[in-house]
Amino acid sequence: MATSDSNMLLNYVPVYVMLPLGVVNVDNVFEDPDGLKEQLLQLRAAGVDGVMVDVWWGIIELKGPKQYDWRAYRSLFQLVQECGLTLQAIMSFHQCGGNVGDIVNIPIPQWVLDIGESNHDIFYTNRSGTRNKEYLTVGVDNEPIFHGRTAIEIYSDYMKSFRENMSDFLESGLIIDIEVGLGPAGELRYPSYPQSQGWEFPRIGEFQCYDKYLKADFKAAVARAGHPEWELPDDAGKYNDVPESTGFFKSNGTYVTEKGKFFLTWYSNKLLNHGDQILDEANKAFLGCKVKLAIKVSGIHWWYKVENHAAELTAGYYNLNDRDGYRPIARMLSRHHAILNFTCLEMRDSEQPSDAKSGPQELVQQVLSGGWREDIRVAGENALPRYDATAYNQIILNAKPQGVNNNGPPKLSMFGVTYLRLSDDLLQKSNFNIFKKFVLKMHADQDYCANPQKYNHAITPLKPSAPKIPIEVLLEATKPTLPFPWLPETDMKVDG
């Protein structure tokens, strides 16, 4: 039963729900406002705090450079506001389609794809030369090849246009988070495991740095390091290999050599710098707005329990038993006052196939602990749709790993959790009844609270980013530390 107690309210973790992928369709039409309104009112009645939505670059800037059309999204935002929910807006600079759960297809803008017809190297590329059109390679971040603009300038202009065209919703407090898309599926990573190219879970994936821009960048980096003879990896296997079948990832393979370490540092640093640069632009675009910036980091839990962490390495997370690949990301976010949003909160090790050597529970503990140690806010979401008590209990445990505190704020607490995703299945009666209990337990058995200040979530105007942190200082965060201890199970079970 819900109550209201000021101490218990400090244990309240807000719950958001991801809207359907095609809520604004590929033709920039908000198709079914009446149907969505009915669903949003059900969410509001269930105590849900807000919703998250992808704001697709491929829809908004479809017609040509700087030709933005925000009208359909304005109608959507108006409806969300009328239903009494808050909004997390994702700047989705990636393609929808080709990843787990993608049921609609929204490519990046055609005028960008047209540039890619004559210059294939604007896309991430694997060693055999296959291009991936989901997202522009970090290699073109600062190349002015898009009708005179760089990729970073494109993203920056888009965010500025969003601010100008959504200023009333920013001022009214509807929009509370801007999640900045930084890669495929909106995640800060390389597209190392594309289903569209035949990758199957739980295989290792492939490095994606063989476009001409990243090749040239690596060539310059090895020359500066005094090793001009070093090349990009040629022994890391194919998408569906296992680590031990490759020269790179096998025991004592290339990944532990000086050459391998140099490559992995370069490959992961490119992502760190990419995120840092775009967050600088996001900070300028939304400076003074009452919003938080956020980014998403992918939960690559397969091969976590072996020495080589192969699937994480191909995705750009240089994480090994003796090197923390996630805490430097958290440290980079700290200067932008940004939230780290992590996936796979619902997963338990025992649910994964044994051949995947999977450790979602340990991975979540590592990433969240690293964020908290860097004094940033961490949020999260489930990776796959689940409607069962076991999954909800795992999410609640991760949201409050050391349980609730009856006398004040909990020692550890996530800033928010976004449930993936709104659907007819979720709203089916028995599923929705369990979901309502989940929301109540996330809220520490408290009534829905419309005033975030009461649970220490007051949103203040966005301050300027702090000065750039030198890469050497970011990489000091790779030194491994033990994660915070977690309770064996939550003290706020939905079925307890």
Curated annotation (Swiss-Prot):
PANTHER family found in the cross-reference section = BETA-AMYLASE 1, CHLOROPLASTIC, BETA-AMYLASE 6
Which reactions are catalysed by this chain?
Hydrolysis of (1->4)-alpha-D-glucosidic linkages in polysaccharides so as to remove successive maltose units from the non-reducing ends of the chains
Output the InterPro entries linked to this UniProt entry.
Answer: Glyco_hydro_14 (IPR001554), Glyco_hydro_14_CS (IPR018238), Glyco_hydro_14B_pln (IPR001371), Glycoside_hydrolase_SF (IPR017853)
Per UniProt, which keywords does this protein have?
A: Acetylation, Carbohydrate metabolism, Glycosidase, Hydrolase, Polysaccharide degradation
Name of the protein in question: Beta-amylase
Q: Which Gene3D superfamilies match?
A: Glycosidases
Q: Where does the source fall among the domains of life?
A: Eukaryota
Tell me one GO molecular function of this protein.
beta-amylase activity
**Modified positions (N-acetylalanine) in chain numbering:** A2
Organism of provenance: Glycine max
List the transmembrane segments: none
User: PROSITE patterns this protein is in?
Assistant: BETA_AMYLASE_1, BETA_AMYLASE_2
